């Protein structure tokens, strides 16, 4: 994840077009021919979303209250991590391969990450990852826009296929410190921000971009919190 200064604007983490829609479709309308790409390169090599873009997207988002959480279950977004591109690798391992360095793979596997190093974006600290029953949770894959948050802000109306694609969309996923991810829970920008302040611009811009691509809405408090962060981004130096 790389931040660059371009034309005086802070350019943030590269993002895939979230829903990878084909012409004639809109967010929430699944296209059965769309496949999620294998993400093995840093996102910044594919595209970039700037603070300026995120500010504009934020102002275009619908603002209203949360819908009831009634009916929410993780399985509404699919049965765990999927293999949407049918390459034999589940999304969790694809994100670990993308975000960790110095990785080793399980013997005989092209997918399963046995160990690696993470520079955690949420805390700014380094984490040694070792796969195992008692150690894997040290690094978790976070949905930047939490699934429960999405459920209460538009995803209830999606098809099951769209929800599964959202849950496995690399643009909305980050490998992060496990305890910090647990503390975040299903918080939005109004209720939780990364402790690592230098990453907050990137984090909020990613949330806004994902919500814009999937036509999710924000609450008034969330809108105001995201705006405060984005308006202050010019004062922040790159995180890397």
Regions found by a protein language model. Give the residues of each.
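Alpha-helical interaction segments
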Residues: 6, 61-63, 182, 193
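Secreted/periplasmic proteins that engage bacterial cell-wall peptidoglycan
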Residues: 68-140, 144-145
């Amino acid at each position: 994840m790389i931040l660059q200064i371009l034309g005086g604007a802070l350019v943030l983490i590269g993002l895939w077009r979230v829903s990878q829609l084909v012409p004639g479709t809109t967010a929430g309308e699944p296209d059965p021919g769309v496949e999620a790409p294998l993400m093995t390169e840093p996102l910044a090599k594919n595209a970039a979303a700037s603070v300026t873009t995120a500010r504009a997207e934020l102002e275009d988002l619908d603002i209203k209250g949360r819908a009831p959480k009634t009916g929410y279950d993780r399985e509404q977004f699919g049965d765990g991590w999927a293999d949407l591109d049918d390459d034999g690798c589940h999304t969790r391992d694809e994100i670990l391969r993308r975000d960790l360095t110095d990785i080793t793979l399980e013997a005989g596997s092209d997918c399963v990450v046995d160990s690696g190093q993470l520079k955690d974006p949420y805390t700014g600290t380094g984490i040694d990852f070792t796969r195992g029953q008692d150690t894997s949770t040290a690094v978790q894959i976070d949905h930047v826009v939490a699934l429960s948050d999405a459920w209460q802000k538009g995803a209830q109306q999606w098809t099951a296929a769209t929800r599964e694609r959202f849950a496995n969309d690399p643009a909305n996923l980050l490998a992060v410190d496990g305890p910090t991810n647990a503390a975040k829970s299903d918080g939005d920008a109004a209720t939780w921000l990364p402790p690592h302040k230098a990453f907050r611009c990137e984090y909020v811009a990613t949330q806004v971009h994902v919500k814009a691509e999937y036509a999710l809405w924000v609450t008034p408090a969330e809108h105001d919190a995201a705006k405060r962060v984005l308006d202050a981004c010019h004062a922040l130096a790159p995180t890397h």
